[in-house]
Curated annotation (Swiss-Prot):
Domain of life from the UniProt record: Bacteria
Organism: Escherichia coli (strain K12)
Kelch-type repeats, residues: 40-84, 86-137, 139-173, 174-219, 222-265, 287-336, 338-367
GO terms, molecular function: protein homodimerization activity; racemase and epimerase activity, acting on carbohydrates and derivatives
The protein's role, per its UniProt record: Converts alpha-N-acetylneuranimic acid (Neu5Ac) to the beta-anomer, accelerating the equilibrium between the alpha- and beta-anomers. Probably facilitates sialidase-negative bacteria to compete successfully for limited amounts of extracellular Neu5Ac, which is likely taken up in the beta-anomer. In addition, the rapid removal of sialic acid from solution might be advantageous to the bacterium to damp down host responses. Forms linear aceneuramate during interconversion of Neu5Ac anomers.
Outcome when changing H297A: No effect on catalytic activity
BP GO terms, sorted: N-acetylneuraminate catabolic process
Factors inducing expression: Induced by N-acetylneuraminate and modulated by N-acetylglucosamine, via the NanR and NagC regulators.
Designated name of the protein: N-acetylneuraminate epimerase
Reaction equation(s) it catalyzes: N-acetyl-alpha-neuraminate = N-acetyl-beta-neuraminate
Subunit structure: Homodimer.
Any Pfam family the entry gives: NANM
Amino acid sequence: MNKTITALAIMMASFAANASVLPETPVPFKSGTGAIDNDTVYIGLGSAGTAWYKLDTQAKDKKWTALAAFPGGPRDQATSAFIDGNLYVFGGIGKNSEGLTQVFNDVHKYNPKTNSWVKLMSHAPMGMAGHVTFVHNGKAYVTGGVNQNIFNGYFEDLNEAGKDSTAIDKINAHYFDKKAEDYFFNKFLLSFDPSTQQWSYAGESPWYGTAGAAVVNKGDKTWLINGEAKPGLRTDAVFELDFTGNNLKWNKLAPVSSPDGVAGGFAGISNDSLIFAGGAGFKGSRENYQNGKNYAHEGLKKSYSTDIHLWHNGKWDKSGELSQGRAYGVSLPWNNSLLIIGGETAGGKAVTDSVLITVKDNKVTVQN
């Protein structure tokens, strides 16, 4: 069926009713990570636990195949990237040997030829959770994410509180009732060279770090879209990293999903059109924060966006809608489109389906 998007009265989005984009994931899948290499999609972790799966998108009989389990334990919010035929997995949130929830700063490598994992003797100089990862000129770049010490301390306090609800309420109030700058989200840009397994300083944002941003890159440019400015408070900011020439430049583009912004959204490119879709946030939190309420999302219900935005002539236009709001899935480039795998919908429910967003002549097509 075709559906005209009347908001802004500019563009049209059509919802394809034919066969599913990809087979359903083997388990409901959210808060995991994924990558694509030579038309083969790899997904894992998050609600899949330590499981990883692959799917050959060019196969006549498309199906998910289980891979060797991840050796680092179940993790949420890890990131991954393919470099020179190997899959690298960065950080994430999980439990340590003592059973405490913590942020990791380690790196694991998966070899598709041998279906085997190895933990590298390499540690990022800071924790990696809520961060983004992208590849440029054979290196992985990481930026954003929560502060490892603050985040780990929060969960240590919760562990000590046990089932004491009064203590838990006090810990939560103490944790959330701070200004954004007091969470020290990572604004550094780090590079990881797989040939040496060394981390290097590559620059830093002139503004602030975010957690749960959407990321997409093409050529010498990378875009970081929305994300958290602090726990429970999103931003509508859009940052552009330009690697053209010898000097990295940071640019701030027009905002999107204003005024509250979202985290866990999806970003991609189709026919040179920059796409941003979905995400989750708390409506009214930005106003609360501006009015001096640091615990900005207290009492607010998380909402899930259906909006699809396109970057056009220096601004964002709402150009389509998802069939339902979703966030915290995996977004990948495929068939000159944005492929979304899994995610969560209202109430935090993990899903198993995929969505393909294609843009042609400023017309958005959504295939479910």
